[in-house]
Amino acid sequence: MDRKERVARLVDHATNPRYKGPLEDADVAMPGGGHECGGSVVVYLKGDGNGRIEDLSWTGQGDTISTGAASIIVQKVHDEGLGMDEILDLDYGEFVEGLGRDIIGSRTRHATLGLSTVKAAIRLYQRANRSGGRAAV
């Protein structure tokens, strides 16, 4: 993908976000971000109890980079059927490279807000699942 295509993809995801909206039956609702990182998101996760994700969505607001990147990572999870451990293993640097480091510039925190919040939601879900409880929603 060249630079122009990467910019168009990011803008498309920011203006037409995928999987955006709360999950009513989520096991986890994980807030992330703040003013210092380009926006805020809440990631909603429903797990199957066996390391797989039944459903994943997000809500939030921010700049084109933070909202576009959040939409891209959630769509990637859906499209590729990634398991929880696979998501936790995703490399932030590789994710930023895929978005286009030249586009992101110094706004790495904006670009990784969605991914870091998805990872935090998974860790909370796994802790609750190991202890036999339910994650805080």
Locations of regions flagged by a protein language model:
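Hydrophobic alpha-helical segments and helix-packing faces
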Residues: 3, 7, 34-36, 66
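Short beta-strand elements
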Residues: 34, 39-49
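Short alpha-helix boundary/capping segments
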Residues: 57-65, 79, 106
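Short, internal acidic amphipathic alpha-helical interface segments
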Residues: 69-80
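Flexible, solvent-exposed loop/hinge segments and secondary-structure transition points
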Residues: 25-28, 55-59
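Helix-adjacent hinge/juxtasegments
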Residues: 45, 54-56, 73
